[in-house]
UniProtKB/Swiss-Prot annotation:
Annotated domain remarks: The PPIase activity resides only in the second parvulin domain. The N-terminal region and the C-terminal tail are necessary and sufficient for the chaperone activity of SurA. The PPIase activity is dispensable for SurA to function as a chaperone. The N-terminal region and the C-terminal tail are also required for porin recognition.
Keyword annotations from UniProtKB, A to Z: Chaperone, Isomerase, Periplasm, Repeat, Rotamase, Signal
GO molecular function, one term: peptidyl-prolyl cis-trans isomerase activity
Presence of keyword Repeat: yes
Taxonomic lineage of the native organism: Bacteria, Pseudomonadati, Pseudomonadota, Gammaproteobacteria, Pseudomonadales
Native species: Pseudomonas savastanoi pv. phaseolicola (strain 1448A / Race 6)
Keyword Ribosomal protein belongs to the record: no
Protein name: Chaperone SurA
Length: 428
């Protein structure tokens, strides 16, 4: 009898349908359950915006493409030894809750109310942090803006007119590959014009962005947040300044394809004098690499910290060990810095470290740091603030363009086999 029951169970188990794979991505796979879960999350986000919710089938290609790009970046992070500790993750969750005026417990309750798992949300935040660190290493660190570019921008009509003006925007991107033929470019132009015509007739922007846009933020309804006009491709600056809130721009050709923008909100600065708190700080940066993993990097930073505590010279150790090319030869000295120009983790530790004291080793997207605060001051920084503002605008503009190019590149270079029924096959 027992044998019959076991056999019956085996037969029953054998006929259970296996979970299907919707894409093979280099050395990993994407399961249908992952895609379905993300589709549900996107539908909930769109519904909260008060827009018509597209059917799952209309969202699946966009969601799958997003999952493929995320997977490729996570694999890069794995190969590079990028990790996010539970402590870092807890801090990030706390920050997200705080931004939404909630405690962590209230945040958990809000997720449950929306039918979302707290553990799933934690893992999604972990993945996003890893992806952010991958992009920091592969994209952001390559971007250079010269002092001459900053001066030229500040002296230009565009810089003078647009630097203080900000726009809350959403976008739709109809992408064109770098090697696109004239026929492909023409087809993209026709598609963009068709979408624009629909929008002018009252079609829902959020829904169209989620189902047609190639932009990275498509599944968020194309929401780009607040942008300086000068961060945007040149055709849009003057257009947005004169445009009423709620209107959309005609499609404009950019290096990445044809873009349509919707103006959600608008605000402008007053150009008043600005006082700024500055900190004189020096640091030593140790980066993980393919030959030194995260734990080994942390241990090296701790050894350097101990040597400084035992009386060795900070500047000499920075010259010997620091992997920050901009400060190592200066003994790690970053000079006087605006805390707001630094990544949040570095800024927080610096602000909490008393003047004349050393921080314990801590981690940012760049690697492991030890810092020393040498001084604090408040200064009239109107000119410097404008220069920093211009630098950020130019850097962000270059970053946006470089990121899209890099994402297309890693997608083109990867082996991707689409197994979603009815989807375009894109195996390489």
């Amino acid at each position: 009898m027992l044998g019959a029951l076991l056999l019956s169970g085996a037969v029953h188990a054998a006929v259970q349908p296996l979970e299907s794979v919707v894409a093979i991505v280099d050395n990993d796979v994407i399961m249908k359950s992952q895609m379905d879960q993300r589709v549900r999350e996107v539908q909930q986000t769109i519904a909260k915006r008060g827009s018509g919710v597209p059917p799952a089938e209309a969202l699946q290609p966009q969601v799958l493409d997003r999952l493929i790009l995320e997977n490729l970046q996570l694999q890069m992070g794995e190969r590079s030894g990028i990790r996010v500790s539970d402590n870092e993750l807890n801090q990030a969750i706390g920050t997200i809750a705080q931004r939404n005026n909630m405690s962590v417990e209230q945040f958990r309750a809000a997720l449950a109310h929306d039918g979302l798992s707290y553990n799933d949300a934690r893992e999604q935040v972990r993945r996003e942090m890893i992806i952010s660190r991958v992009r920091q290493r592969r994209v952001a660190e390559r971007i250079q803006v010269s002092q001459q570019e900053v001066k030229n921008f500040l002296a230009s009509d565009q810089g003078k007119a647009q630097l203080s003006e900000e726009f809350h925007l959403a976008n739709i991107l109809i992408a064109t590959p770098d090697s696109a033929s004239s026929d492909a470019i023409q087809a993209a132009a026709v598609k963009a014009k068709g979408i624009y015509d629909q929008l002018k007739k009252g079609a829902d922007f959020t829904r169209l962005a989620a189902t047609t846009s190639s932009s990275e933020n498509a599944l968020e309804g194309g929401d780009m947040g607040w942008r300086k006009a000068a961060q945007l491709p040149p055709p849009f600056g003057d257009m947005l300044s004169a445009m009423p809130v709620g209107d959309v721009t005609p499609p404009a050709r950019t290096p990445g394809g044809f873009i349509i923008l919707k103006l959600l909100e608008k605000r402008g600065g007053q150009g008043q004098a600005q006082m700024r708190d500055e900190v004189h700080v020096r640091h030593i940066l140790i980066k993980p690499s393919e030959i030194r993993n995260e734990e080994e990097t942390k241990r090296l930073a701790e050894k350097i910290y101990d040597r400084i505590q035992n009386g060795e010279d900070f500047a000499e150790l920075a010259k010997s060990f620091s992997e920050d090319p901009g400060s190592a030869l200066n003994g790690g000295d970053l000079n006087w810095v605006d805390p707001n120009s630094l990544v949040p983790e570095f800024r927080q530790v610096m602000n909490e470290t008393p003047q004349g004291e050393l921080s314990k080793p801590f981690k940012t997207a760049y690697g492991w740091h030890v810092l020393e605060v040498l001084g604090r001051r408040s200064t009239d920084a109107t000119d410097q603030a404008r220069e920093q503002q211009a630098l950020n605008v130019l850097r962000n503009r270059k970053y946006d363009e470089e990121l899209q190019t890099w994402l297309r590149q890693i997608r083109d270079e990867a082996y991707v086999e689409i197994k979603l029924p009815g989807a375009t096959q894109a195996a390489q």
